[in-house]
Amino acid sequence: MSQDNATGAAAASTSNFLRQIIDTDLEQGTYAGRQDTAGHALPPIITRFPPEPNGYLHIGHAKSIWVNFGLAKEYGGRCHLRFDDTNPVKEDTEYVDSIIDAVHWLGYSWQNGTGEHLYYASDYFEQLYGFAEVLIQRGAAYIDSQSAEQIAANRGDFTRPGTPSPFRDRSVEENLALFRDMRAGKYQDGQHVLRARIDMAAPNIVMRDPVLYRIRHAHHHRTGDAWCIYPMYDFTHCISDALENITHSLCTLEFENNRPLYDWVLDHLRDAGALPAPLPHQYEFARLHLTYAITSKRKLLQLVNEKRVDGWDDPRMPTLVGIRRRGYTPESIQLFCERVGVSKADSWIDMSILEAAVRDDLDARAPRSVAVLDPVKLILDNVPADFNEPCSAPVHPKQPELGRREFPLTRELWIEREDFTETPPKGYFRLFPGNKVRLRYGYVIECTGCDKDADGNITAVHANIIPDTKSGTPGADSVKVKGNIHWVSAAHALEAEVRLYDRLFTDPQPDSGDKNFLDALNPDAKRVVTAYLEPTLATAKPEDRFQFERHGYFVADRIDSQPGKPVFNRVVGLKDSWGK
């Protein structure tokens, strides 16, 4: 499938196709009047978010969460969180816990007036086994004793039909006996599988007698060693939906070819009287393809294992634990999802749309502060050594009710190294000998020169305060200047580690085609500096977010930031530095 670049506006233009489907079902009463097994009326729509607990959720999952929980809320329904935990080899409670935390962090709940709607496919193992026997008894499933390699080879391809298994015509009695012996643990892994009997010449290869159960002697994180056979996803998923009274099973496009199998399983069980109508229906929407990122679990695991990142929660990672640590807010992710909308066709969404959503959200909520990230000392020569002038600035320029923050102006300050030059280029309005600038929230100063070490490196800048020019006083505008620089008092500044994060890759599609995604790693995706911060930041708590004026938005690291030893991460810059 071709993937064209798309803006958020373009993607959002088709964002209502799922709503149209739901509206039609509501108008036609498709799921009206339903009750659960306890006789309680069921809501008009029920959706679900069904992750497999074999890894950490990423930004693509956030879109699925937003779609499923958001539509359920919009229509007065409910959304279930269900773990599709049918592969004991790859799944772990660590991932279960992280997924629960991530969904909660995004602001969603699977609880409502009828209780807790957190489910595990493994809780249905006994029922799933019973449904498999129903299919066997109907002649719709059989035990195949071919090896996995033989099954794959005999499935055919898009140009030739599959070859029926030599075991396809086993009797119902033999199939039942073998299946029960499989459950009893009489066979080794791979010795037998249960397959659906559909059509080995079907144009859709998924329908060529897919495997429904396999033998897997492995410890399960919930059921322990109670089972040695496990159902496949395609068999489990649709039945779990039906058991939970799901109405709209919303999946991403890679499951489109699996929809006929979804319907085949449910239709057979309905016709056998094992499941009541109306049955759930599957609908597909485009998954999120974000530029300058990868979401493949295998490739993300490679980054972690090769220590190219600092773990799954590295702020450069697209995992939800990573972007949370980066400082993204749940509201910004929801805003991003709203802007890109829901489409039927795959497309690439530019990272700048996500970053703009984060920027817009933090602009409205983040208190302002000052940080000097590449410091050089500025000495005000015409004031005494004990000079200490109180200055103030609004906590947020658009929210005066938040008050003002106080900080001192002293004789020695820290300023950004880039705010001084001896030989200014055209259009440079900051400090150079003879030039005047305003110290933000303070006085106008005139630069008089600088000090250098033996190697010619600038070690200090010198200037004089121009009296009666303090910001907010009657004489503030008596001296006109074009430059305005930020600063912190050298005596009062808070020293802190600041981690300057950027995009992990330099290529917008780092793993497309035959590219080696490792070749596109951005060497400047993380820089660590020792910075000097406004003293008001001493009280910052983990996950407190701020705008560092002139620099961007920053967050106190949720893991490493400690009282008296703060660590800040750059969330996003004030402007898009990657735009063409």
Swiss-Prot record:
Molecular functions per Gene Ontology: ATP binding; glutamine-tRNA ligase activity
Binding site for L-glutamine: D84, Y233
Catalytic reaction annotation: tRNA(Gln) + L-glutamine + ATP = L-glutaminyl-tRNA(Gln) + AMP + diphosphate
Compartment(s) where it occurs, according to its Swiss-Prot or TrEMBL record: Cytoplasm
Residues given in the record as ATP binding sites: E52, P53, N54, H58, I59, G60, H61, A62, K63, S64, T252, R287, L288
Enzyme nomenclature, EC number: 6.1.1.18
Complex and partners: Monomer.
Keyword Aminoacyl-tRNA synthetase: yes
Keyword Glycoprotein: no
Keyword tags: Aminoacyl-tRNA synthetase, ATP-binding, Cytoplasm, Ligase, Nucleotide-binding, Protein biosynthesis
Family assignment from sequence similarity: Belongs to the class-I aminoacyl-tRNA synthetase family.
Broad class of the protein's primary localization: cytoplasm
Residue interval(s) of motif 'KMSKS' region: 294-298
Enzyme class, spelled out: ligase
Residue span of motif 'HIGH' region: 51-61
Name by which UniProt lists this protein: Glutamine--tRNA ligase
GO biological process: one example: glutamyl-tRNA aminoacylation
InterPro entries: aa-tRNA-synth_I_CS, Gln-tRNA-synth, Gln/Glu-tRNA_Ligase, Gln_tRNA_ligase_bac, Glu/Gln-tRNA-synth, Glu/Gln-tRNA-synth_Ib_cat-dom, Glu/Gln-tRNA-synth_Ib_codon-bd, Glu_tRNA_lig_a-bdl
Gene Ontology cellular component annotations, sorted alphabetically: cytosol
